[in-house]
Amino acid sequence: MAANILVIHGPNLNLLGRREPAVYGQTTLEDINRNLTVKAQAAPVALSIFQSNAEHELIDRVQGAMSDGTDFIIINPAALTHTSIALRDALAATSLPFVEIHLSNVYARESFRRTSYFSDIAVGVISGLGAAGYELALQFALTR
């Protein structure tokens, strides 16, 4: 079981619940984080949560996972999914297992959203299950 799990939320996820609720749902990022924290405490595992709209801050946090005891990463790269080779390289450099999360079904949206720089190096991808995708990723991490 992964004892130290890092959850990373990418750009614009701080707007969840207000930004395009028909696409991303009514659940706020605070709701998601609170729910994950409760589940992690019950497990019990250490859970760290980080959100940034800045690519370099996300990269710095991923690189930090190499030396802070992180065992597993749950990441929603958001729009960086389709653009950030640098974030992909940081994840690859850690050699840590990670699950890629998307709240919406990226395959049912615009064609550019169907390209991910992360999926081929992730241990799994969860797409289109809304906030429940985070819970499923945490449940999976707890079995690793």
From Swiss-Prot:
A Pfam family hit: DHquinase_II
Gene Ontology process terms (BP): amino acid biosynthetic process; aromatic amino acid family biosynthetic process; chorismate biosynthetic process; quinate catabolic process
Pathway annotation from the record: Metabolic intermediate biosynthesis; chorismate biosynthesis; chorismate from D-erythrose 4-phosphate and phosphoenolpyruvate: step 3/7
Top EC category: lyase
Catalytic function, reaction form: 3-dehydroquinate = 3-dehydroshikimate + H2O
Site note Transition state stabilizer, residues: R19
Binding-site residues for substrate, renumbered to this chain: N76, H82, D89, L103, S104, R113
GO molecular function: 3-dehydroquinate dehydratase activity
This enzyme's EC code(s): 4.2.1.10
Active-site positions on this chain: Y24 (proton acceptor), H102 (proton donor)
Keywords: Amino-acid biosynthesis, Aromatic amino acid biosynthesis, Lyase
Subunit structure: Homododecamer.
Function of the protein: Catalyzes a trans-dehydration via an enolate intermediate.
Family (UniProt): Belongs to the type-II 3-dehydroquinase family.
PANTHER family: CATABOLIC 3-DEHYDROQUINASE
Name of the protein this chain belongs to: 3-dehydroquinate dehydratase
